Amino acid sequence: MTKKYSLGFVGRKAGMSRVFTEDGRSVPVTLIEATPNRIAQIKTVEVDGYSAVQVTVGARRAALVNKPAAGHFAKAKVEAGRGLWEFRVEDAQLGDFAVGGEIKADIFEVGQKVDVQGVTKGKGFQGTIKRYNFRMGDATHGNSLSHRAPGSLGQRQTPGRVFPGKKMSGHMGAVQQSTQNLEVVKVDVERGLIAIRGAVPGAAGGDVIVRPASKA
């Protein structure tokens, strides 16, 4: 597809594989399950104050769709998906899209740079060594209690508190993260797959958003 769009694409991380180049080099790739995104709403400056395309993907049982969402999907005459995502586009490009239409993986080209956004794997409650790569205390030489302790958390009576943002133990992972400037290695519209060089955030089966690179 020669026309460039600023909108993204919602896919599902399938896992990692590798492809071989013509000169025999092995390239690690992440496979993105790229089923067509169904357009549920077109937002315009006149009505909504900005231009955007709202999409859904996948399927959700009717029992799990609440009434407002069911009415929204019914109005657009699209099957209820597992969520709603929105992508800003230029006002002049809105005419290329219609409610009920589909966006396919061919909006991307081989060699194009993209940003991939996903939710990282959750690691649960972790200490500072795993969470922030702190250095461990001595294993011996008189140390018997503080092998993995973080050390001092502050000063003394002044300021008499722990500053916000102090690196401490806590929940690790399960946050939204973007990996930038990854290369599209292959686009297979018939099989619904996008192969992207390198790793992308999240576990296999998680939703990811693929967008044209913002810093390319």
UniProtKB/Swiss-Prot annotation:
Q: Which residues form the signal peptide?
A: none
Entry-linked Pfam families: Ribosomal_L3 (PF00297)
Q: Which UniProt keywords apply?
A: Methylation, Ribonucleoprotein, Ribosomal protein, RNA-binding, rRNA-binding
Any idea which residues bear N5-methylglutamine here?
Answer: Q157
Q: What does its PTM field state? A: Methylated by PrmB.
**HAMAP family given for it?**
Ribosomal_uL3_B (MF_01325_B)
Protein name stated in the entry: Large ribosomal subunit protein uL3
Task: State the species of origin.
Answer: Xanthomonas euvesicatoria pv. vesicatoria (strain 85-10) (Xanthomonas campestris pv. vesicatoria)
Q: What is the lineage of its organism?
A: Bacteria, Pseudomonadati, Pseudomonadota, Gammaproteobacteria, Lysobacterales
